[in-house]
């Protein structure tokens, strides 16, 4: 972690330390009671793969050749600034069969002790709380047990199965309806989290959840690590899954860093913020 990154944006170009790079942005102070700060993070190959089918697996996995300790450090730093994490029911189904990438952050490993200490110094809870988006409410109850010290919310639609709702609530979760039918509406979910007092919200789920948040125009920042590798493969996930966004969501680079050390080929660390819509944007309603 001691080898530096090269900052490309903003100018001027210069070497910067990796450890502490994202913590220094103090994301937990950027939101307020009306507008929480919502951010997300992905690592992708150059050909857009964030997950691939794996042999002897029921679910896709982050490509092992692009995962690396330096990106993982920054992932933990982003989690370290969150009041609450947004994830999905899919994560907990993966977890119970041993296919989840890892436990939900912040990691308890010694390498991240400084992040946990930083949270304490900033007056944040020991760990961020958890918000689960789920239309089906198919969430294995035993998968929630490792997080019993955190507050757990489950967001679903108005037509959710009442028996599943009762079962989750009986096991300590707070179930909130945030949309008509079975699906969750991103804007309503963020509004409900704001009323619960959350100011910094970190979305760590997959392409469907990210699409839901983008569609609702609630994403304030995207952290995107681009591993300089080409992977191919016919079964894969990319950043977004869902209907065509109209208008397209323009994202401007507010930060860009080059890391030549990991993985093979190096990686680019991008920070993107949404471009404000103008009256002439195609597809604007």
Describe the function of each predicted region.
Residues 1-285:
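Enzymes that bind and transform nitrogen-containing heteroaromatic metabolites
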């Amino acid at each position: 972690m001691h080898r530096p990154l090269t900052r490309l944006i903003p100018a001027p170009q210069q070497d910067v330390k990796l450890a502490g790079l994202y913590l220094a942005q103090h994301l937990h102070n950027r939101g307020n009671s009306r507008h929480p700060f919502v951010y997300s993070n992905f690592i992708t190959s150059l050909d857009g793969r964030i997950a691939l089918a794996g042999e002897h697996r029921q679910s896709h996995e982050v490509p092992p050749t692009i995962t690396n300790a330096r990106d993982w450090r920054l992932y933990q730093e982003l989690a370290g600034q969150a009041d609450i994490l947004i994830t999905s029911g899919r994560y907990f189904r993966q977890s119970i069969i041993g296919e989840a990438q890892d436990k939900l952050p912040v990691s308890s490993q010694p390498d991240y002790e400084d992040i946990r200490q930083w949270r304490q110094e900033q007056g944040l809870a020991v760990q961020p709380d958890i918000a689960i988006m789920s239309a089906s409410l198919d969430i294995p109850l035993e998968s929630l047990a490792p997080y019993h010290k955190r507050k757990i919310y489950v967001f679903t639609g108005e037509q959710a199965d009442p028996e599943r709702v009762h079962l989750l609530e009986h096991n300590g979760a707070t179930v909130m309806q945030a949309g008509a039918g079975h699906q969750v509406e991103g804007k309503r979910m963020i509004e409900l989290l704001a009323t619960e007092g959350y100011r910094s919200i970190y979305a760590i789920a997959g392409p469907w959840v990210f699409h839901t948040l983008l569609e609702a125009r609630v994403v304030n920042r995207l952290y995107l690590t681009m591993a300089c590798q080409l992977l191919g493969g016919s079964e894969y996930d990319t950043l977004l899954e869902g209907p065509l966004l109209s208008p397209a969501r323009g994202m401007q680079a507010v930060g860009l860093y080059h890391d030549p050390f990991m993985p093979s080929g190096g990686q680019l660390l991008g920070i993107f913020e949404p471009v404000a819509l103008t009256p002439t944007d195609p597809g604007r309603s």
